[in-house]
Curated annotation (Swiss-Prot):
Record carries keyword RNA-binding: no
GN (gene name): matP
Quaternary assembly: Homodimer.
The protein's name in its UniProt record: Macrodomain Ter protein
Keywords assigned: Cell cycle, Cell division, Cytoplasm, DNA-binding
InterPro entries found in the cross-reference section: Arc_rbn_hlx_hlx, MatP, MatP_C, MatP_N, MatP_N_sf
Purpose: Required for spatial organization of the terminus region of the chromosome (Ter macrodomain) during the cell cycle. Prevents early segregation of duplicated Ter macrodomains during cell division. Binds specifically to matS, which is a 13 bp signature motif repeated within the Ter macrodomain.
Amino acid sequence: MKYQQLENLECGWKWQYLINKWKDGETITKYIDSSEADHAVSELRKLEHEPTKVLEWIDLHMAEELDKKLKQAIRAKRKRHFNAEQIHTKKKSIDLDYRVWEKLSTRANELGCTLSDAIEYLLSEASRSEKASAAVSTLKEDLSKLLSD
């Protein structure tokens, strides 16, 4: 699915991504010499409030091996950004124990669906089973009343 690209917003994301990588101690520039790398990073840090100039910095200074990772990160961020706008596409997160996730994953694979679809299916099956059980209990009570009279 294609999402609209918003240059200013995405340049800000790219700047943030690069700064976070730099703070984590990763090499973000293509330079081997540390003084050149430090100079390039200081230039990048000055661009915080000029997001569109980040693209120019990326073309001039960014390490080649970071290009693919940056594009993937921005694509994922764009998807999350646009999905968060609508309640039905907004993602929620839940914590599962590993064994619970494993059982759910196995069941989802058996059903040939996603984890979310499997949860939805299992909940509807449980509800249906509960209703059937209540109906059987009511029938048993009615039958026992008829037989005791």
